[in-house]
Amino acid sequence: MTRKNTTTNPWAKFHGPNLGYVIEQYDLYVTGAGSVDPELQELFEIFGAPSFQDDVVTGDNTATHFSPQNTGNIEKILKVVQLVEQIRSFGHTLAHINPMEDAANGQSLLEKAMNELSDADLKAIPAKTVWPDAPEGIHTALDVIHRLKEVYTQSLAYEFSHIQDSEERAWLHQMVESNSLRQPLSNKKRTALLKRLTAVEGFEQFLHKTFVGQKRFSIEGVDMLVPVLDEIVLEGAKNGVEDVMIGMAHRGRLSVLAHVLEKPYSHMFAEFKHAKIEGAVANSGWTGDVKYHLGREQVVSNEEVSTRVTLANNPSHLEFVNPVVEGFARAAQENRKKSGLPEQDTSKSFVILVHGDAAFPGQGIVSETLNLSRLNAYQTGGTIHVIANNAVGFTTDSYDSRSTKYSSDLAKGFDIPIVHVNADDPEACLAAANLAIQYRMLFKKDFLIDLIGYRRYGHNEMDDPAVTQPQVYKKIKNHPTVRAIYADQLQAAGVLNADEIETITQFTQEQLKSDYAQVPPADTSDATIHVKVPDVVAKGIQPIDTGVELDSLRAINEGLLSWPEGFNVYPKVKKILERRKDALEENGKIEWALAESLAFASILQEGTPIRLTGQDSQRGTFAHRHIVLHDTDTNETYSPLHRLPNINASFSVHNSPLSEAAVVGYEYGYNVFAPETLVMWEAQYGDFSNTAQALFDQYVSAGRAKWGQKSGLVLLLPHGYEGQGPEHSSARPERFLQLAAENNWTVANLTSAAQYFHILRRQASILGTEAVRPLVLMTPKSLLRHPLTLSTASQLSEGRFQPALEQENLGTKPNKVKRLVLSTGKMAIDLAAEIESDKHEYNLDEIHIVRIEQLYPFPAEKVQSIIKRFKNLEEIIWVQEEPRNMGAWHYMAPILFELAGDKVKTGYIGRPDRSSPSGGDPFAHKAEQELIVSHALDVKYNFRQDKLEIEVFSN
């Protein structure tokens, strides 16, 4: 028998979705159609059917009594609950978020559910039954539906259903469903907003009329981007943020520079006129860049707060600035002045990334960068993304540029809340901006605003968009600007009258004309094809003594080989480390990894922080580094470099995600914003670094020449031909050498642990100086433990990095030397190994070998001095393991011709031209390599008399 207790009502605590669940469970309980939750089954047995008795107050203040004791009412409640959730989840399909469309096209998703309930049904259900947090004045379910449709289907549309954290999802719904998000703006703020829109529109139209045909990539159609950025920056400053980093492409960039970053109009106009104007700050390198790629740094303030805003320099390679700016932010957030890991404070800075609607889903770098957002080594406490959505990519319509409904859909996979907003509704746009910054500051996670507008002109101002989008541009031609729309709204609301609005417009025009009048005539007197590189750059890195006292090295080594008591090091790793114990003693040998650790420790002791990342950088791809140890029992980690004495600089080494482009961009950005830090990126294999080629081309190699943006980033690229096939042999040094010019970076391929030690210390010594430049290192694989690459303690404690090294025990009879062999990296070691073996029958008196350790800048003076010693020299040969069309040959050939003069032949020995870097057969590789070595060491292997004829090894 069912027992009833009428004194209590356990159902009162169930509302909304929970109520729907209880009703479904009771239906199963009554019909026996399925299993019922045991706790609810007990309640049903004790209390019977769920009772939600309440008085429903209707709009005419009459009260009706409602009790869902019968099945019909239960079903209606369930349908209302489902409808409420559908509005929250799919209301965006009904929203008017596209100013170029009259109505939303998603009616069918909700109309069925809405048609199943009459107004009378809805009026009979208390609001609190289906919406526990219903605000004051919402009495019935009909009120609930009207209110939620007003929230979710107007010019703001929300996508929160994909958010996995229930607390975050509840907070987001509460924010948009309460009145807190869209509080009416004061008349003062509404007037200020109109003034801002008038300035943006006036600036763009002034450029359009004054500099006819010049590219400016107008913001018009998404003008609200500027006030949105204003709002985010201001609210960030109110929250104590010290640095706001902005990354964006060229669309709207000039207006953002002029308004958000307060670049004077006169300076902008001077760039269009190619005029010199007093007070303009040079923001470019010696070759420069177009005006819509340039960045700026500015302290932005109002009467209450201030913050520093940095707009990053940017190429036209869309979205590749994203990880760079994330690196800026992480560098700004971290305190690197203590030993151990840096101390991060994500409240100190945050990132705003402005995306294009075609580029956001189209460029893979976007996904790579989003993937960094929750990773310990890369997270920055949340980025605010703004898609400046003009619904077209150059001439490509959205249906040809993405496979998703919205351009923002990619963000759903990364648990990012999304707000779509009509760019013709200024106050809705500001509400979206406020929600974004509040969410970021509270939850320390990313947020996305899809600012949907249009593009008033073509991709650039010389392009006619009506050729490819004729129907849309008929609409756009007759569509009022957002400034005009908002001005009409303020006039209708009595905030401003027509004369006051006209006064605002005239003030903007007078300001533009006044600033233009300050710009002198064009001045092309300094236009020249001869670009002057700064002297400190042109001179290259001067010799620097980088040795470390032997006692200091021994003390460091002792610290590197110690760990906390009770810490259980993996036995195999322990043996590797213990072998290093006597490496600095007499007759000891230092291998590559130990030389690196000693360099790191000595650099840290001199006050330089270090950051190293890569896919396997803690252990090392080749199980050589072991700079982070793992306890075999607890999996806790320990790095000896965190506990060494006399260190006041941080050390961080992180395993990166399986990404090259985003990580290289991030580390480059980190280094730019933390110039005192030795920042290093290590490829798993150098072969894979080419997926970051755009970063090497646009930023690392050219950033200083274009923008004056200095970097000391170190690239560690494992390289060497060992019969492992075309994906595990070549870091493609030819590409880095092709980009080498104007002393833009150092490219090296080393042959000893000591050389690695010294070049790292040299790189650390130039950080933060005008001499700084990136360092590209072809690092070893099989050579990591090769006997011929090992070094002695004295080679670390004395001297400096040597750009060129002579092979020991050769060239001792200068008058007999006929052939000078130049080589680098593993190829040089293969030659040395053959020389030291007892198998050869070469006449070594007639040959000398020079290892070119630093390929760029080439050590010409050093090599020339060596050549002069050999009066009977007949030929200079470049020997490499790469195919002739790869490696350093095409870079070296003109250098050799100049070094050789008229009397000495030059030549090449190596693999022939090939389309693939390496073959896949290890036996064929070995045979080829042996033949290259034998031809290089056999002086009888003759070359043609004409020095321009290159002898090529072939099978």
Swiss-Prot record:
One term of GO molecular function: thiamine pyrophosphate binding
InterPro entries: 2oxoglutarate_DH_E1 (IPR011603), 2oxoglutarate_DH_E1_bac (IPR023784), DH_E1 (IPR001017), KGD_C_sf (IPR042179), ODO-1/KGD_C (IPR031717), THDP-binding (IPR029061), Transketolase-like_Pyr-bd (IPR005475)
Gene3D superfamilies registered for this protein in UniProt: 3.40.50.12470, 3.40.50.970, Multifunctional 2-oxoglutarate metabolism enzyme, C-terminal domain (3.40.50.11610)
Catalytic activity: N(6)-[(R)-lipoyl]-L-lysyl-[protein] + 2-oxoglutarate + H(+) = N(6)-[(R)-S(8)-succinyldihydrolipoyl]-L-lysyl-[protein] + CO2
Cofactor(s) of this protein: thiamine diphosphate
Family recorded in the similarity comment: Belongs to the alpha-ketoglutarate dehydrogenase family.
Record PANTHER family: 2-OXOADIPATE DEHYDROGENASE COMPLEX COMPONENT E1, 2-OXOGLUTARATE DEHYDROGENASE
NCBIfam families in the cross-refs: 2oxo_dh_E1, PRK09404.1, PRK12270.1
Protein name as annotated: 2-oxoglutarate dehydrogenase E1 component
